[in-house]
Amino acid sequence: MQQITPIILCGGSGSRLWPLSRKSYPKQFVPLVGNKTLFQNSATRLTGKQFKNPVIVTNSDYRFIVTEQLQEIGIDPGAILIEPEGRNTAPAILAAALFEYQINPDAILVVAPSDHIIKDVDAFQLAIEEAYKVALDGQLVTFGIKPTHPETGFGYLELSKISTAQAVPLKAFVEKPNLTNAKKMFQSENFLWNSGIFLFQARDIIEAFKKYSPSDLDAVNLSLNNSINDLGFCRLNLTDWVKTENISIDYAIMEKSDNLSVVPFSAGWSDLGGWDAVWRENVSNANGVNTSNNATAIGCENSLIRSEDDSIEVVGIGLKNIITVAMKDAVLVADMSKSQDVKKAVDILKEKKASQATQFPKDHRPWGWFESLTIDEKFQVKKIHVHPGASLSLQSHKYRAEHWIVVSGVAEVTIDEEVKLISENQSVYIPLGAIHRMRNPGENPMELIEVQTGTYFGEDDIFRYDDVYSRGQGAKG
């Protein structure tokens, strides 16, 4: 069996699992079920002797989160492709296919989202082996999930004949149904949930684009050929990329192709499309209550109660069918049956221009992360975490001075011409306008508290003189 290259799609806005999932830090990077994040689990289940190193397709904002989370689980990516902007799944999958085809014209790809869970990894890998067999014959293979209940939130796959595990020809894609039709399809054995997972030879999906979407093939090919290597990331060319159609792989290719097969499988799959799904997939007590470490439930039934901040204790009393998720800057309380309306709430917050709609409390950067602890008109306090060996840019500020207090590790601090080491419980003052840099010279993470004073504290008040991450003026961090 030839090694298969995993293609992991890592985009999305994450609004359905707000406030824990947001545009700046969507659900795939969050440990919603277990200790690993959804992205880490997605990468882990596509490892082993039958798989090559994964190719990740993501955007510029997530690139360092991707590398950090892969490092945490010891997985080396074969490549990380950076989309200049989101154009849905068709251009993303095509870019990865062309990238792999240039390396190996016989490449076989398995394409998977980064934000799903699959509990039975062995069953999933057996399904991949079944798909591999028919992909060698030129089939484009999709994976169908055996429904466990009538579901209106998923698209469906109609089979040409009933099958339990063997690949069979696909008869039709079915749009998300109403409840009446969902019940009918659940009772039939000919319909499966559309998982959004695919397996095919790179040459076959490229040929499909050549036949059904040649303009996208031309644009993505140019974008890849005109890409640049940016700190090891393959940054696709924007000018060519925006010429692609913003369209899913289902609409662009799959619904038009005549060489489609489906492999059915049951492996504890969920796309975690709402807080009700998160509740279902986590272990609950005898009353159906799932709580985090900082949450207490008294006389509650069928409820999810989570605190995502060590300083916030959440107590639920007499709750039934309720979702409660508390974070430092936002709290969600919702009826379990209305979990899909969370997205509407996020839209309202956006209209109100509330930063909580899209911005995660922790702001991730190539060197680590920071979070704002408090902010006022004349000051802001941040907690800053710097990875071992990492450094911030050499920079200055026009509107603020800074005071750094190291609370863990050692900081190498440059202020104008002076370089000094600041140890735990020591501090240093950065005058307004001073050219400065912070670096972690140690082998362990370094953390400090930063107190800013001045008249403006925006992340665009940064003038860079030197930056190892090649960020321009006004770029964040």
Task: Walk through the language-model features, giving the residues of each.
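Left-handed beta-helix
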Residues: 2-3, 203-405, 410-429, 436, ...
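Catalytic metal- and UDP-sugar-binding loop of GT-A-like glycosyltransferases, i.e.
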Residues: 9, 112, 406, 451
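Residue-level signal for inorganic ion chemistry
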Residues: 29, 39, 96, 115, ...
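A residue-level structural signature of the nucleotidyltransferase/glycosyltransferase Rossmann-like core
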Residues: 109, 190, 197-198, 270, ...
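A short, conserved beta-strand element in the Rossmann-like catalytic core
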Residues: 117-118, 428
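Noncatalytic nucleic-acid binding interfaces
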Residues: 448
